[in-house]
Swiss-Prot record:
Belongs to the HrcA family. It comes from Nitratidesulfovibrio vulgaris (strain DSM 19637 / Miyazaki F) (Desulfovibrio vulgaris). Negative regulator of class I heat shock genes (grpE-dnaK-dnaJ and groELS operons). Prevents heat-shock induction of these operons. Transmembrane segments: none annotated. Signal peptide: none annotated. It comes from the Bacteria. NCBIfam families: hrcA. This is Heat-inducible transcription repressor HrcA. One of its GO terms (molecular function) is DNA binding.
Amino acid sequence: MPSLGQRETQVLATIIESYIASASPVGSRAVAEHSGLHLSPASMRATMSDLTDLGYLEQPHTSAGRVPTARAFRLYVDSLLRPLPLGSAERDAIADELSRQELEISGILRRAANLLSGHARQLGMVVAPSEDEARWRSIEFAPAAEGLVLAVLMLEGGLVRTRTVRVDERYGQDELVRFGNYLNEHFRGLSLSEARDRIGHELARAGSRLEEMCVRALALSRRAVEHMGDDRELIVNGTLNMLDHAEFTDVGRMRDLLAAIEERSRLLELLDRTLSERDVRITFCQDVADGAPDGLRGCSVISAAYGGDTPRGVVSVVGPLRMDYAKIVPVVQCVSRALTQLFRERFAAAPCRLP
């Protein structure tokens, strides 16, 4: 694909920004008025025709104007986008809203999804952190009821997981305390996934070399932690915002979008790709290769990881291809950074409960 000259680039940027604002095909007269280029009508039409031939514009059959393609938007967000930074008051308001006195991660992340959807006027999505890579701080057991033991696992980063384990024998409180002391001595500092693997390995080769107490402690802990980390939460807010956009006024299109939101595993897979990124990731859901649910075709996903050196999750905004990236990208960045700071300052020191 040949590179664009300054004239073509300026014309394309003008068309994209006009289309973002209006959702309507953009004609040569509107481009001439807003591009700042002093071109004759014939020269402007020729430039737009060249951009169409190059795959950056397309012309709906019912209109003389042009609309930008996904290729045009990719060039725009990669090379032409000039984000509009949030003011200090707006940044502080987001940080204050997230840092209200609330120790439950789920509540804070629901608040984050609400902030994303409210500021962007699109869908806001937040993926809760996976605790698999969080490091084991301590585990405690307590009798819960006849045939049940409560396990409370505390992880670095302030995450707390609880599980009720069904057992076939009675355990005294003193015995359960000894179990916890033994496990914490051997597994503190390991990630949850490493500890889970180590527990299985130790039980497989236990034989006669371990005391009965150690074997029973390992067996109980395996049942307590074997499924921890499997049920990550995906929070979605702002579905009704989509009805404000021309792309979703069709009932069938909106139904497809709602169906896509229900495809939790594919959404998580799509959003988790952001975890390896250092900054905002913008994904255009255009074809099967991107792995997005079918109902997101023609949508864009603006996402960023949060958490830093604590367990990491993802914040994102989902909307039509013609989203106002200059305004929304800074919002996603701000929420991501505010959550990261919050996790570092508060949750490393004070446990918070996951659902």
